[in-house]
């Protein structure tokens, strides 16, 4: 870890292999909270690259509990962290998409920044959030919508909890979670908390094997496709190039509203 820290403190990027190895060692419990905290803050100060995030995600995927599906599914989630406290929009959207006939492997957790996370919403509706892998798989295959509760599928994250709580600030883990769907979906819709990360995250998903993705950030600060402002979207279709563009919901005839309408 010392060599990695020196590397980061001198603003040198890690190769994908080095990023993979350091995250694998963290997920294996080889470092204490102080070392992990130092690593996370040095990385944040330097700024994360596509290769670094890809390597980290590959290591986390290696440690996760996998879900095997017989047919394609999509994930719909956000990083959170927009600090606007809206209702859980991505979870509501999953019911619409699933109702339209698209299978959804919803990967999520409890609230970190909003009024409620996907797990909180489902629990309030009386839906069990900690089903065995077999039951969640059956839900996705037969009903068209299943919930994959992140803590149950990423047990190795326990080694980073102490450092994350002590730092109490955004780190690379905030963008890694949505990249590590246990069902290894190839199609994904993702909201992100900063506009500079839409293209980065889309390129990481491409490197991880995704074929169809949309990563977006509303210019009102939302990690959603917004109806209160224009939205920056980075999109990849059929494994092609990542294209970034601006989207305005009013072009589809939707009225502009204030963010407070989403509370």
What is each model feature region?
Residues 78-83, 108-114, 153, 219-220:
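Acidic, glycine-rich active-site loops and adjacent beta-strand->loop/helix elements
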Residues 1-85, 100, 104, 257, ...:
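Acidic, glycine/proline-rich low-complexity segments that act as flexible tails and inter-domain linkers
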Residues 43, 97, 205:
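Hydrophobic pocket-lining residues that define ligand/cofactor binding sites across diverse proteins
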Residues 10, 28, 46, 77-80, ...:
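Short glycine-rich loop/turn motifs that provide flexible caps or phosphate-binding loops at active sites
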Residues 7, 62-65, 86, 101, ...:
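Glycine-rich anion-binding loops and their surrounding alpha/beta cores
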Residues 40, 87-143:
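A glycine-rich phosphate/pyrophosphate-binding beta-strand-loop-alpha-helix module
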């Amino acid at each position: 870890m010392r060599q990695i820290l020196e590397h980061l403190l001198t603003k040198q990027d890690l190769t994908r292999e080095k990023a993979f190895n350091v995250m694998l060692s963290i997920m294996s419990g080889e470092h204490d909270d102080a070392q992990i905290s130092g690593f996370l803050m040095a990385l944040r100060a330097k700024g994360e690259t596509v290769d670094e995030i890809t390597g980290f995600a590959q290591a986390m995927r290696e440690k996760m509990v996998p879900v095997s599906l017989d047919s394609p599914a999509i994930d719909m989630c956000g990083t959170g962290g927009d600090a606007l406290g809206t209702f859980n929009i991505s979870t509501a959207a999953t019911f619409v998409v699933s109702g339209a006939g698209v299978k959804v492997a919803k990967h999520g957790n409890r609230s970190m920044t909003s009024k409620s996370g996907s797990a909180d919403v489902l629990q309030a509706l009386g839906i069990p959030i900690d089903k065995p892998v077999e039951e969640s798989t059956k839900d996705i295959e037969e009903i068209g919508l299943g919930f994959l509760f992140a803590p149950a599928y990423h047990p190795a994250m326990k080694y980073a909890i102490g450092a994350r709580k002590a730092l109490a600030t955004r780190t690379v883990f905030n963008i890694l979670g949505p990249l590590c769907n246990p069902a290894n979906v190839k199609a994904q819709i993702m909201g992100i908390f900063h506009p500079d990360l839409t293209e980065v995250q889309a390129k990481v998903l491409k490197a991880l094997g995704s074929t169809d993705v949309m990563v977006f950030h509303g210019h009102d600060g939302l990690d959603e496709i917004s109806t209160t402002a224009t939205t920056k979207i980075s999109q990849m279709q059929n494994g092609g190039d990542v294209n970034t563009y601006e989207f305005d919901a009013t072009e589809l005839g939707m009225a502009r509203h204030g963010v407070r309408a989403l509370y």
